[in-house]
């Protein structure tokens, strides 16, 4: 059976959560006997940050051999940003217009890959397949975020296109009701992300010379909001001189990164708050962590949070944050607090002064992630894909 994973987005060297999920799905489905291909859209050439298994064919829609190379170009990017200033919906339509140029290339990918099923990783990708190409190949559309965040400013044509999906997958049970507000659709399926737990268990209650609060995620203000963590830590840093904050993640949002660095300097935290960038050695990060701090505004099913909890690190998040407020159970595997630096600071301090509490809730965190074991999640996907083929 031929399976095409479609993610029309930058992919070369990009360390996003969606790309991480795609890499894992490619490996899991290949192990289950599928012939897997991947199509992405990137003006750059090179390798993905998260490697694909040997034997998985990777197509770049913008650089298809023997076909016209597509350039999004500075003009298109500028037009998109101008549109965004007036309407997020207009900006997304502008984004789609770039992919719409690539219809011949996408048709060529379908001819070469001959998929029995396509899994679409982003809404504009699904729109191109289901509206632009009107393909009869069954498409499973993945929703990688809170539907309120996805669809509030989504173009109507994008929503109508997604309604042609064979199935739409959501990451949390509560997301089905949210998605139903925007889509006239009744074939939603809940499958969470898999939690890949390395062969290690950490002890967040152990004695160390330096204790660490860790945050992992791209450094960006609208979603991940690392500035709140810095503000929270600044309130208690002098009380806990043997504690540091390590922030791991892509720093492509240069304006926000500059603001974060300024905030660190303003509070005199240069020696204890560090922007570490990206890494492929997460085991070492987890072994050094005592608390996982996650001040996100909204999430779909955060890989970093779930993996930190899976190795036994207690977490702090906001009760208002979608997905986080379902993964973290207050005082069972972490703390859920009202949004804001003050409450976040108090929760951090509760953990920082009590090693046994960290150890106890860390054990709870590890236990709570077991239902998301890879074999359970990928078996669910295998069943769903085969259901699509059976319905043909």
Question: What positions do the PLM features span?
Answer:
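Conserved donor-binding/catalytic core segment of Leloir-type glycosyltransferases
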Residues: 4, 205-224, 230-233
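A conserved mid-protein helix/loop that constitutes part of the nucleotide-sugar donor-binding site
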Residues: 16-24, 220-238, 245, 258
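Glycosyltransferase donor-sugar binding loop
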Residues: 39-45, 216, 244-259
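Acidic anion/phosphate-binding donor-loop and adjacent secondary structure
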Residues: 149-153, 180, 194-211
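Nucleotide-activated donor-binding/catalytic signature segment of Leloir-type glycosyltransferases, i.e.
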Residues: 258-277
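Aromatic "clamp/platform" in nucleotide-sugar-dependent glycosyltransferases that forms part
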Residues: 278, 297
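Short hydrophobic beta-strand element within catalytic cores of glycosyltransferases
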Residues: 314-318
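Conserved acidic donor-binding segment of nucleotide-sugar-dependent glycosyltransferases
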Residues: 319, 329-331, 335-342, 350-356, ...
